[in-house]
Amino acid sequence: MFMTFTSTVGYPDPPSTPLKNSLETLTPLPVGTPPSGTTAIFSPRKSLDALNWYADLARNASDSLFMTFAFGMPDVFKDVYANALAPLRFALLEQKTLSMKAGLEKKAEEDRIQQLRNKPENVFAIGDFIRTNEVDGWLKERLSGLNAHVRYVHNKFMLVDPLGNDPIVICGSANFSEASTIRNDENMLVIRGNTRVADIYLGEFMRQKLIVFSCFSQTPSL
């Protein structure tokens, strides 16, 4: 399947409409809950149905939800974190907003994220680096300057009920965004029922959350 995908999106870039038709035929979107095992979903697609489907899965998590966002949180997931069923909802963000100039629009977006952070069900970690050597166990950090747009978080995965017996892991190259759904060449895997995979991704999520969100008044524990 991935060979077919690679051939379909190969050089030179194929026209958009035939490409989207081919990828939706190759990787049709499941209806409702994904089947057990692994399902591939390739982009670009003709509509935002895949993004909305991811949001529905997140919204219907029963115990816990964990997501990463590299370029701000899209509106559809703001609604998820405002109204989802799960009593425990974590989000790991590169930054509070999409890249935008300072102004009223950015302030409104930051306020919206802060409102979500204030909800007792939500725990958000937003990328930053340690700025002091004065806390025992931590060393002052600086950025490498390798990438001006993504400095801390560039993982793309969602964990739905990862601590249960029937977890769902969604991972791959696509950000949970409109661009990665309808414009970019991306590939995602939806893995249902594999508790080992869910454990690994949950461990990675909490490792990154520790780095960007830890209480620096305490010595880090391993």
Where are these regions (language model features)?
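PLD-like (HKD) phosphodiesterase/transphosphatidyltransferase domain
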Residues: 18-97, 157, 202
